A protein has these predicted regions:
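A generic structural signal for tightly packed, nonpolar segments enriched in small/aliphatic residues
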Residues: 28, 38-39, 75, 160-424
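Short amphipathic alpha-helical segment within the helicase RecA-like ATPase core
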Residues: 1-226
Length: 424
């Protein structure tokens, strides 16, 4: 109906574009009409078919946002009607921020104002709420991306800790505590500390608490792996592509992005963010294959490969999460290359000890377009972690994503937990 209304007021320009074959209206098709009227310099049309998937609907919104941003216009209007769901309105504002992001800060867009024009009775007040939520998520996403893109000589564990502190300084709803190496050693976090032994950069455990609930409800704990640069340690990675190992802290960056978004939207929940931050380097002080270390939980671990280090920092952070008596714990980590072989680059691998939590994450993934696929935590895989010299080994042969999840599950017996392998 909104398209018909616009077409009528523009003397049938949309009908003419379709009749001339310039615009098909098919899913994710697009057309830009220049000088559609005296006051409209650009009319951007994006095709949306009935029954489009969530992924396609996100793509078409991002396509519209991209066309707006590259049109060199200062003011734009986005027409919405009762065919738009609330989450799609959130995606509009999120997409503008996402697409306009530039690490160098040299975005060429001249857009200064985007108004949503509501037709056919869509609630303006609800639209404003959705827009604000989308902007908060968009800024959180861009913070995550920016931290990931920052070179490892700048984005060190200390740098991440300072970012977390500055976020809490700006928002009274967030409390940040930084555990230094001496404090972690006193707590028995020798697994976490073993990864950063050889680095000149001190390891940190960043603890962020968002208390938005008016009641004493149990918090949700998010644990994000942050290896700010991963050489593999003594089990050295090949040189090709090693520059991308600065992205091995994106689990931790995701947690920071979530906390940033929470500080803006003021949700009525409690969330704890735990970010173990280390740098994995080789030197005379490095942990060696064959070494046995003791985790905070008391479980001993034989290190068979120092490049399987993410699980070594996560296991102590997962043990530390116990003190918050969490309702759920979700860890987010670029943990295994094996997940790319299993699922490619379109899906997050998930393992969980709770079908309740797994179903929540699958549902959220389907509704947001950021899908997950559950992998099994069967005892046959867990048995591959047997060690002759410790309680378990840090690698377990085939099915590396699953055995990594089995490793982490040993430290999550006291709560409902899920692991998200975001390496893909």
């Amino acid at each position: 109906k909104s398209v018909q209304h616009i077409d009528k007021n523009l003397d049938g320009v949309i009908t003419k574009m379709i009749q001339d074959g310039d615009f098909s209206g098919k899913n994710i098709s697009t057309c830009v009409v220049r000088n559609a009227s005296k006051n409209i310099k650009r009319l951007i049309l994006v095709g949306k078919e009935e029954g489009s998937s969530v992924q396609d609907r996100i793509k078409l919104i991002e396509l519209g946002a991209s066309n707006i941003l590259k049109s060199y216009i200062t003011n734009a209007h986005w027409v919405i009607d009762d065919n738009y769901e609330d989450w799609e309105i959130e995606i509009i504002s999120r997409s503008i921020l996402k697409i306009n992001y530039s690490f160098k800060g040299n975005s060429k867009s001249s857009l200064s104002k985007l108004d949503l024009v509501c037709l056919n009775g869509h609630s303006l007040s609800n639209t404003e709420t959705c827009t604000q939520y989308g902007e908060a998520v968009g800024r959180g996403m861009n913070l995550c991306r920016h931290l990931g893109n920052t070179p490892a000589n700048i984005c060190t564990p200390t740098f991440l800790a300072e970012k977390a502190k500055s976020l809490s300084d700006e928002n009274t709803c967030i409390k940040t505590t930084i555990l230094e190496e001496s404090e972690m050693r006193d707590l028995g976090m020798l697994s976490l500390l073993s990864v950063g032994n050889a680095s000149a950069q001190p390891s940190k455990l960043i603890v962020m608490e968002y208390n938005g609930s008016k009641t004493m409800q149990q918090p949700i704990a998010l644990v994000g792996k942050a290896v700010t640069f991963d050489t593999g340690g003594i089990s050295l990675k090949p040189g090709r592509g090693m520059d991308e190992m600065k992205f091995d802290m994106c689990g931790g960056a995701s947690v920071l992005g979530v906390m940033s978004a929470l500080s803006e939207v003021a949700l009525d929940i409690n969330v704890v963010g735990l970010i173990p931050a280390v740098e994995n380097m080789p030197s005379g002080n490095a942990t060696k294959p064959g070494d046995v270390i003791k985790s905070m939980s008391g479980i001993t671990i034989e290190i068979l490969n120092t490049d399987a280090e993410g699980r070594l920092i996560l296991c102590d952070a997962l043990t530390y999460a116990n003190r918050f008596k969490p309702k759920y714990v979700v860890d987010i980590a670029t943990l295994t290359g094996a997940v790319i072989g299993a699922l490619g680059k379109f899906t997050t691998g998930m393992l969980s000890n709770s079908e309740e939590l797994a179903e929540i994450l699958v549902s959220c993934g389907n509704s947001s377009g950021d899908r997950v696929w559950q992998l099994p935590l069967w005892k046959e895989y867990d048995q591959q972690l047997k060690s002759n010299f410790a309680d378990l080994a840090n690698i377990g042969g085939e099915a590396g994503t699953i055995t990594a999840g089995c490793f982490l599950s040993r430290f999550t017996k006291d709560y409902k937990w899920a692991h998200l392998d975001i390496a893909g």
